[in-house]
């Protein structure tokens, strides 16, 4: 299984070698807030990805400076006009858990798989609405049934005095 994943990664890299844009970023944050939830202390959050004809593939991570809370996200996005489609794999590990990235057992994995869609009204009025739903991985109710957790976001970008 691991060999297949490595082979797929190599093939994807070769396919995107002619990418229009490769990006590498790193943020240092005093606290990690995700979708309004406190998800960690001071962290470094690097990312690596590439854009090609509306398709974006990237890896993003977060690791705390003091604790052993880590996150590795793999994401795929496709943008066409004002519509964006998302597929995300979030992997989290806490200090109490061993690092088992390749554990995909539905009730013990650190992975959460999510799909979503976002739509922006127009460039002149860039109000966006997005919806994401978890469909696999670590997302269960107390009774053991899949939770199908969903998140909706309404956003409008703005600046304050050219900041």
Predicted regions span which residues?
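Residues embedded in well-ordered secondary-structure elements
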Residues: 8, 13-15, 37, 65, ...
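Residues on the lipid-exposed face of transmembrane beta-strands in outer-membrane beta-barrel proteins
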Residues: 26-28, 46-52, 74-78, 115-119, ...
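Histidine/lysine/aspartate-rich catalytic loop segments that bind and position anionic ligands
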Residues: 135-137, 144-149, 155-159
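Cleavable N-terminal export/targeting peptides
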Residues: 1-21
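Short loop/turn motifs that connect adjacent beta-strands in outer-membrane beta-barrel proteins
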Residues: 19-21, 54, 122-127, 158-163
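Short glycine/proline- and aromatic-enriched beta-strand/turn motifs that initiate or cap beta-hairpins
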Residues: 20-65
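Outer-membrane beta-barrel translocator/channel fold
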Residues: 31, 61-71, 81-116, 120-143, ...
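Residues that define the transmembrane beta-barrel architecture of outer-membrane proteins
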Residues: 20, 40-44, 68-72, 79, ...
